[in-house]
């Protein structure tokens, strides 16, 4: 499923495509910079069921991906650990430096090796 519609002029909305008929329905309305929330009233029961199934399948696929890519967990947990230890004032700058550190891939690789030896 891919979002491909554009919002009507003068309105900022997120759109998603559903089912065989490619019906486009508004799911979330935004105002300014924030999302107001889902508007289930715009979906018929069949679309709500499709959305629920899509969410479940997406969560399952994401979980499978994370289980087969342990490095993602190591990257995120390492980032949070360093962030909480250093408590930087500029989190965006800190994140940019953390994830572009040329030593990061070898650190993650060493952690993966260490975890494999432990199991």
Swiss-Prot record:
Domain RIIa residue range list: 70-104
Distribution of this protein across tissues and organs: Abundant in tissues rich in highly ciliated cells, such as testis, trachea and olfactory epithelium.
The protein, known as: RIIa domain-containing protein 1
Gene name as annotated: Riiad1
């Amino acid at each position: 499923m891919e979002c491909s519609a554009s919002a009507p002029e003068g309105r900022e909305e997120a759109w998603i495509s559903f089912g065989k008929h490619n019906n486009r329905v508004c799911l979330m309305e935004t105002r300014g910079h924030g999302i107001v929330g889902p508007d289930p009233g715009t979906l018929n029961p069949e679309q709500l069921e499709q959305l629920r199934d899509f969410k479940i399948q997406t969560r399952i696929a994401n979980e499978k991906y994370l289980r087969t890519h342990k490095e993602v967990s190591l990257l995120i947990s390492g980032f949070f650990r360093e962030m909480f230890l250093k408590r930087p004032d500029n989190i965006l700058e800190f994140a940019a430096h953390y994830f572009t550190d040329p030593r990061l891939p070898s650190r993650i690789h060493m952690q993966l090796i260490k975890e494999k030896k432990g199991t």
